[in-house]
Regions:
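Pepsin/retropepsin-fold aspartyl endopeptidases
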Residues: 1-177
Length: 177
């Protein structure tokens, strides 16, 4: 289904029978998506340069295989790459490829992702192989700057723009039980 609220290309639910020859992937766990009423929680496998056949078009796109999203959707980044004409009287859709590009490669590698939750700056997503921090860990300072209500959004942005958190001096309270 078309989902203009999903900013990615193509998403499909995880199924153990799925098998792709593409090893260009990124495995993430945590709360990657926010819906209108909640946050998701699960594992996401993001593939780049996946060959896709869409009608008569052979393309490459990013594909997300998700344990948290249970629908097969095409998102706005994919939708914008086509001109759509919907004929409601005859129940037909006509599609023409336009000049808008379809993202097929990762623009950056995500190791971790932070979000302000309940007035705390928490790690909500991590790349599966990362072991330095855990989901739910609270970040209390960044580069010796204490996280406060006044700067938490600014520090969240800094963290989420930084590909390698090893380049930052972080003080973290572990959530491990």
């Amino acid at each position: 289904k078309m989902d203009s609220g999903y900013t990615g290309n193509i998403i499909m639910p995880y199924n153990e029978k799925l098998s792709f020859k593409n090893d260009k992937k990124l495995e993430l766990e945590g709360s990657l998506f926010q819906t209108i009423s909640s946050h998701t929680s699960g594992s996401e496998i993001l593939y780049e340069k996946m060959p896709i056949t869409f009608g008569s078009f052979n393309l490459e796109a990013k594909l997300n295989v998700s344990t948290s999203i249970k629908a097969q959707n095409i998102g706005i980044d994919f939708i914008k790459a086509f001109d759509w004409l919907i004929d409601y009287n005859n129940n037909k859709i006509y599609v023409k490829r336009n000049q808008n590009s379809i993202e097929s490669v990762f623009t950056r590698k995500v190791m971790y992702y932070a979000k302000v939750k309940a007035e705390k700056l928490e790690i909500v997503v991590k790349e599966k192989s990362q072991t330095k921090f855990n989901l739910g860990d609270e970040i209390v300072s960044v580069n010796r700057q204490k996280v406060t209500a006044e700067n938490q959004c600014e520090l969240q942005d800094l963290l989420n723009r930084t590909e390698d958190w090893n380049s930052l001096q972080l003080e973290v309270i572990s959530n491990s039980k």
